[in-house]
Amino acid sequence: MRKLIENNKVAVLYSPGCGAGLYTWNDDKEKILDLIFLPELITYVLDVRKNEKQGYEIDLNKVINILNNYLELNINEDIDDYYYLSGIYKAQVQWLNQGAPFHIDVTDTGSEYIVTDFLYA
């Protein structure tokens, strides 16, 4: 699995403020890990977020092209056969310490959040 790492931090894609989480609404957690760590998709989301004031927004066709190119998929109209991508429109990137344990959880309203604080006995 490829990851975007800068300054010993790993970029993780998730979808806060969304009724259908990018990670939590996909049943195949192993397959979705390729997506939430994919450097090219994360770079695209970071670029869109940086330029939102200029009217940039997530383009599903661009996302599909990224997935096709880098995950060697051949996705067309049947994107839901591979990933449930409703959460991609509100996707954000969180930088976590490399090797740190984390979990993506979801609120009752479907908003994802990243848990990094774990209790240890």
Features from the language model and the residues they span:
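Catalytic phosphate/metal-binding cores of nucleic-acid and nucleotide-processing enzymes, i.e., regions
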Residues: 2-121
